[in-house]
Swiss-Prot record:
Its main location: plastid. The lineage of its organism: Eukaryota, Viridiplantae, Streptophyta, Embryophyta, Tracheophyta. The keyword Transcription regulation does not apply. Disruption phenotype: Malfunction of the NDH complex. One of its GO terms (biological process) is photosynthetic electron transport in photosystem I. Part of the chloroplast NDH complex, composed of a mixture of chloroplast and nucleus encoded subunits. Component of the NDH subcomplex B, at least composed of PnsB1, PnsB2, PnsB3, PnsB4 and PnsB5. NDH shuttles electrons from NAD(P)H:plastoquinone, via FMN and iron-sulfur (Fe-S) centers, to quinones in the photosynthetic chain and possibly in a chloroplast respiratory chain. The immediate electron acceptor for the enzyme in this species is believed to be plastoquinone. Couples the redox reaction to proton translocation, and thus conserves the redox energy in a proton gradient. It comes from the Eukaryota. PANTHER family: PHOTOSYNTHETIC NDH SUBUNIT OF SUBCOMPLEX B 4, CHLOROPLASTIC. This is Photosynthetic NDH subunit of subcomplex B 4, chloroplastic. Residues 1-24 form a transit peptide.
Length: 175
């Protein structure tokens, strides 16, 4: 069995900046002596000013090196393979976009899938429909039954009082 591990390192990290480069020289038919030294100096100052403010996220020549090291059982030799990848800003953007889209797809797909726990008797044993509103509906049903029972008891007491009052009147009339 071969054991392997992989490491990623940044090698020869050189971040280019615009003030290291000289400004572009125009060599067209209209380019002549009239383009004075002051204009070139102004252009150089603008390039330096922009270099202090504007930076790209990653330079185009950022090498990412993958080192694969394998050690074979019973052997003392180590086999090393090096691969260098240069990732551009567009490639990094594509990787992140793929990750975001894959994550959104996973959330939508697995969010809409059936869940055996919520469909089980353990969860719906009390009569729930999975929405959560059944708790309030059940509570309202219990309260409605309790009110109906209370009204029934009050009505029975009121009828008994009236019947008792009528009996007293009948007894008073008969005496």
């Amino acid at each position: 069995m071969a054991e392997a591990f992989t490491s990623f390192t940044f090698t020869n990290l050189h971040i280019p900046s615009s003030y290291n480069h000289s400004p572009k020289q125009n060599s067209g038919p209209n380019h002549g002596y009239w383009l004075s030294k002051n204009v070139n100096e102004k252009r150089e100052r603008n390039l330096m000013r922009g270099s202090l403010c504007v930076r790209k996220a990653l330079p185009h020549d950022l090498p990412l090196m993958a080192v694969m090291v394998q050690q074979i059982e019973g052997m003392r030799d180590i086999i090393t393979e090096k691969h260098v990848w240069h990732l551009s800003d567009k490639a990094i953007k594509n990787v992140y976009m793929f990750y975001i889209m894959f994550t959104c797809w996973g959330c939508l797909y697995f969010g809409s899938a059936k869940d055996p726990f919520y469909d089980s008797e353990e969860y719906r044993g009390d009569g729930g429909d999975g929405t959560g509103y059944w708790v309030y509906e059940t509570q309202e049903d219990i309260e409605e039954k309790a009110r109906a029972e209370l009204w029934r008891e009050e009505l029975i007491e009121e009828i008994e009082q009236k019947v008792g009052g009528l009996r007293e009147l009948e007894e008073a009339v008969t005496k």
